Amino acid sequence: MKILAIRGRNLASLEGDFEIDFTVEPLSSAGIFAISGATGAGKSTLLDALCLALYDKAPRFAASGESINLADVGDNQINQSDVRNLLRRGTSDGYAEVDFQGVDGHRYRSRWSVRRTRNKASGSLQPQVSVSYTH
């Protein structure tokens, strides 16, 4: 598999839409590159987006032995290991999307998304939408 692009919206420290396209310069000709930046700039969130889109999981939310619920909007709570916690606070929806080339040479797109009711930041988190793949 070759990652061609990572994009998303409103995930953790990355507000609004973001995209990294590995098919255009300067990344298309780079053999190796570094993801660097200040604390909170979104380095880990980029990797979370990749994992969410491909596997519906994020390593930072690996299941622990404890089940701790965190406060969400209103009186709602959400488990600390729920990947929907990656939705940026104060936003109504978010997604992670990855374009990749498979070993068969075809291009694919994988997408994970989350939203709140009525598309309002004050709405309850909706049940998680499963990952979808397109060819």
Range-by-range predicted roles:
Residues 1-133:
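Extreme N-terminal "head/tail" segments of very large remodeling/mechanoenzyme assemblies
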